[in-house]
Regions:
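Conserved, charged catalytic cores of large soluble enzymes
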Residues: 96
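Catalytic cores of secreted or luminal carbohydrate-active enzymes
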Residues: 106-137
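Catalytic cores of eukaryotic secretory-pathway lumenal/extracellular enzymes that build
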Residues: 99-102
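Conserved alpha/beta catalytic core and glycan-binding cleft of carbohydrate-active enzymes
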Residues: 1-77, 81-84, 90-92, 133-134, ...
């Protein structure tokens, strides 16, 4: 979203330049009230005999990326407990049974709920995950060469944004 010397903006489909001048101008989200929930999207894309078993770890990865990325994270209410909208892509005219938060899911999916709560606490405790300026991001965030592994990894270093930790390694 902001200028970084290690990012090649020529490969982007929507723009050849960054669209934000500061990380705080980028709102990061996977789902909102306007479409499918995260779990609905996953159910549409993850197929096979063990798909239901694969959804929670994928959901954890999604939340890990969202809450460790620079910018402002946005989490739709209920995502932290695998709330769905019964596959409804636009629930504007749907009944409360589709749109309400099913609080029983908090107990059923407690592992994910606690995991997301822990990620929020990590983000709040470490200002390196909330670098406010493009200059701070350019100085503190360094991508690692992971080749063709499919892994994205970077460090937040030198006490980025006044963090108590000298260096943080983030890898997905």
């Amino acid at each position: 979203a902001t200028q970084h010397p290690q990012v090649d903006y020529n490969g982007l489909l929507y723009s050849s330049v960054p669209y934000a001048s500061a990380p705080s101008q980028a709102v990061n989200f996977v789902a909102s009230h306007d479409g499918y929930t995260v779990i609905d999207k996953l159910r549409l894309s993850v197929k096979g005999d063990h798909a239901d078993d694969e959804l929670p770890p994928i959901d954890k990865l999604i939340h890990t990326i969202l809450l460790t990325a620079q910018g402002v994270p946005f989490i739709r209410a209920g995502e932290e407990m695998m709330q769905d909208k019964q596959g409804e892509p636009n629930s504007f005219r749907s009944p409360d049974a589709v749109n309400r938060i099913d609080w029983a899911l908090k107990a059923k999916n407690r592992d994910l709920f606690d995991y997301v709560r822990g990620l929020i606490a990590l983000r709040k405790a470490h200002p390196a995950f909330r670098i406010p300026t493009a200059e701070g991001l350019q100085q503190g965030l360094h991508f690692l060469d992971t080749g063709d592994s499919g892994v994205i990894a970077y460090t937040l270093g030198e006490y980025a944004n006044g963090d108590a930790w000298k260096e943080i390694l983030v890898a997905y």
